[in-house]
Regions:
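Short coil/linker segments at helix-helix boundaries
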Residues: 56-73, 80, 86-124, 130-159, ...
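Alpha-helical repeat scaffolds
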Residues: 32-42, 65-76, 105-119, 145-157, ...
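"A position-specific structural signal for the A-helix of alpha-solenoid helical repeats
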Residues: 49-56, 87, 94, 131, ...
Length: 295
């Protein structure tokens, strides 16, 4: 079963670059969502089948409250797994970003607890390691954040996947405002990708055990730091090719990254066409319009 929800805890800025927002529930679709949900509830499917359908529906419409409930129901029906706990942690993390800070504490604590439980069940589960490192860095210590623990999990990630390990260390360094050190870690990650002949690999298999947002992250860092733009381009092309309504990063942001990477390798006409694609998806995309004016 393909994951219906993909998570990476994203901060507002990394080394000065604006980050893509998560897609959110559109109130315009509220009535249609309610109709589809009612149809599932009235269907003759088994309880588990209904839960899976509710998961897909809530994920597609980005209705976080129902997504959390459906994931909790699935865990009750199937038992805990690292994958389900990771997804539940991610759903709570995004909900925490959507509500008033006063009401976010419950969701933040649930996020950390579920990532922790996921790694107790499977210490080598890469998506949970990636997400937990970033969450521990972003959450205040009073609520359970702990950069020292994040560094320990980053070291564990390094043993399992050195590329992701260097990305994690780079992220931690950027949070600690050690920008030069962060760039050094990211550069090591891209050097490894070059040594792996990344662009010639079967990327579906390459990312099979990683979060679906990892290729976007690779492209984003490549763009921001001007590191290995050809690799960043391969990564973002893979992300776009595999994009579905269940993804949480807006598609226009993927095309925005692609346009900048095309420009970086000297393909100006292709970059111009690609930024137009981004703006066709979202004509109100200010960052893309601002960048387009520089061409």
């Amino acid at each position: 079963m393909r994951l219906v929800f993909f998570f990476v805890f994203i901060s507002g800025l990394v080394l000065g670059q604006e980050k893509a927002p998560f897609k959110q529930f559109d109130e315009v679709n509220k009535e249609q969502y309610a109709l589809e949900k009612k149809a599932i509830d009235r269907s003759k499917n088994t309880a588990l089948e209904k839960t899976n359908l509710r998961l897909r529906l809530a994920s597609r419409y980005k209705f976080q409250d129902d997504l959390i409930i459906a994931l909790e129901d699935k865990i009750k029906q199937q038992g805990e797994s690292a994958q389900l706990l990771y997804l539940l942690g991610g759903a709570n993390g995004i909900k925490a970003l959507q509500v008033n800070k006063m009401f976010s504490i419950t969701y933040v604590k649930a996020m950390l607890e579920n990532f922790k439980r996921a790694l107790i069940l499977d210490p080598n589960y890469l998506p949970a390691l990636e997400a937990y490192v970033e969450a521990l860095c972003m959450v205040p210590s009073l609520l359970g954040g702990d950069i020292d623990r994040a560094k320990q999990f980053a070291a564990q990630l390094m043993q399992l996947d050195p590329v992701q390990g260097f990305f994690a260390l780079g992220y931690i360094a950027s949070i600690e405002e050690q920008d030069e050190q962060a760039v050094g870690f990211y550069a090591k990650a891209f050097k490894l990708l070059e040594q792996q002949s990344f662009c010639t690999q079967d990327l579906k298999n390459y990312f099979a055990k990683s979060s679906m947002n990892l290729p976007y992250k690779m492209a984003e860092i490549s763009t921001a730091l001007q590191l290995s733009p050809a690799i960043g381009l391969c990564a973002i092309n893979h992300f776009i090719d595999r994009y579905t309504p269940y993804d949480i990063i807006p598609l226009e942001w993927a095309y925005f990254q692609k346009a900048q990477l095309l420009h970086a390798i000297g393909k100006i006409n292709a970059a111009t066409d690609t930024i137009k694609e981004s703006l066709e998806i979202n004509p109100a995309f200010e960052a893309a319009k601002k960048w387009q004016r520089t061409l």
